[in-house]
Amino acid sequence: MGRRALDGPSVILEHSLTFFTIVNNLRLKLDRAAISLEDLAAKGPMKPEELRGFKDYDEYVKNEDITTINGLKKMPPRVGVREVPEETHYRTGWLLSEEMTKMMLDEAMKAKLLIHKSKVDQKVCLTKQMMMDEFDIIRGLIMMAYPAYYGLGEWEPIKVILENREEFDEKMDLTDDLPADKSSVWVCGKELQAEKFFYDYFGKNEKSKYVVKVQKRGSGAPQREPMIDE
């Protein structure tokens, strides 16, 4: 995870750990949202799971009720003024106007830049509020493009993300999300206990700066970071 100065030596580490994990998880979520927004803008809405990978899916559904596929998920209504080929056949290729597509792609890029690691070198502190504001912008843009999500299936990734319906299999551990109750703070190669204060380890010097890393418990010491320049 990125660097951040602690609020002071008297801060209890549990509070800092909660803050760090919230920022880390929001950053990852915003990255997923940016990618999903980009895919929707450039490739159109995602098909139902039953039709993904089908090249000529119109032939597949012509004898079916157009609103359902084998009695399962509903096909989203066609929304868009253009159609482009979609190589993976996971998405419909139905695109909105060039102006709306550009707005969506531009916003996806802004979101990526907001959370880019270059912000560390620029000494820009990424906050929860900054990311929540970006989510609000993306949500408003989606409502403008697809009012009330009309034209998008329940499985559309950006819709799932904005509605907080993402699910992860903890056994597979495929996500870098950090649950606060299963993570720990590391400083100078030392794992700090959440119930203690920072000064318990490093004293009460208010001017000291440390590189703090957070990762899941049991994964060992993180890689050492370079010294922070004044």
Give the residues covered by each predicted segment.
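Ubiquitin system architectures
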Residues: 1-230
